Amino acid sequence: MRTISVILGGALAAAFTAAVLAQEPRLVSEDMMVPSDPGIEVFVRNKRPADMTTFRPERIVLFVHGSTYPAHTGFDLKLGGMSWMDYIASRGYDVYLLDIRGFGKSTRPKEMAEKPEANPPIVRGDAALKDIAAVADMIRKRRNIPRLALIGHSWGTALMATYATQHPDLVERVVLYAPVWVRETPSPIRAGAGPLGAYRTATVEQTRTRRFNGIPEDKKADIFPPGWFEAWADATWATDPVGAKMNPPVIRAPNGSMQDSIDYWSAGKPYFDPAKITAPVLLVHGEWDRDTPRYMSQALFPLLVNSPGKRYVELAEGTHAMYMEKNRLKLFEAVQAFLDESGRS
């Protein structure tokens, strides 16, 4: 199933995006479901300029989300009139995002219809990588290209990096935003001891508290422009109609990523070998990020020994969720500069 719409840039309330959207081309948006494993369909969204007729590897990007929230409510949520997906597409890119199975608009595994304690953690990295591979294959065939660029956020950085080690000839560039690496500190979203269930739940207020973790007290009041967090939360929690019926409403997230973290990152074992990545890599991190602390990026960067033109950018006054904060444009600009280099090389 595919849904196509046309998006027109408009006037913005936020000053920093007004000038950007004034120059935006008309964008086409297309939603589709891509088959993965038997019985699993992955939600994919594509945005591109309406007049785009030539598709080149250096101008095609695929984004994947982290361990709790889907891609389409973060990467393509209009805040101040513009989403990150819009920002990239309006610069002449063919941009895709996917919700991994169990998240957002993709198929929910049958275990999510049962109580979490009834099953072990679902949607581990190997399953998520099948979804990514299915979507990447579809894009390459659709556009008749040999490679594409990858953007991963949080857990998605481990997935995209792993994909790049497994398929080096299919990857143009890799952006790892809030990179995951071997832990020296406890995970902020791993609560309690004992075995994990199939999935976990989070309320809006629990998430709001986590979002402020690491921000200096005198900076908390204005980290989110008015209404931005609420807009994201409304869009995100609406993707889980089952969780919405609970009191208080929750979003359910598969625990496979948490089990992988226990078995690998928290056990001192890397999930992937950075030396096997042969594409250019950008690590980008917000200084107030406590979910994936700075030491992770600093440890990972020197291990990317075969990545030509690798770089690491630390952004001031940003957290793990900088894409929805007041300084989001700094994140967009840093990533865009890296993506644009491919077309000049």
Task: Set out the residue ranges of the language-model regions.
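Conserved hydrolase catalytic core segment
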Residues: 146-151, 155-184
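Glycine-rich "HGGG/HGxG" loop immediately N-terminal to the catalytic nucleophile
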Residues: 71-73, 98-120, 320
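Conserved alpha/beta-hydrolase "acid-adjacent" motif
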Residues: 290-296
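Short, surface-exposed "cap/lid" segments of acyl-processing enzymes
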Residues: 51-97
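Catalytic histidine-centered segment of alpha/beta-hydrolase-like enzymes
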Residues: 318-329
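Conserved acidic catalytic loop of the alpha/beta-hydrolase fold
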Residues: 127-147
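Alpha/beta-hydrolase
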Residues: 185-284
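N-terminal cap/lid segment of alpha/beta-hydrolase-fold proteins
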Residues: 23-56
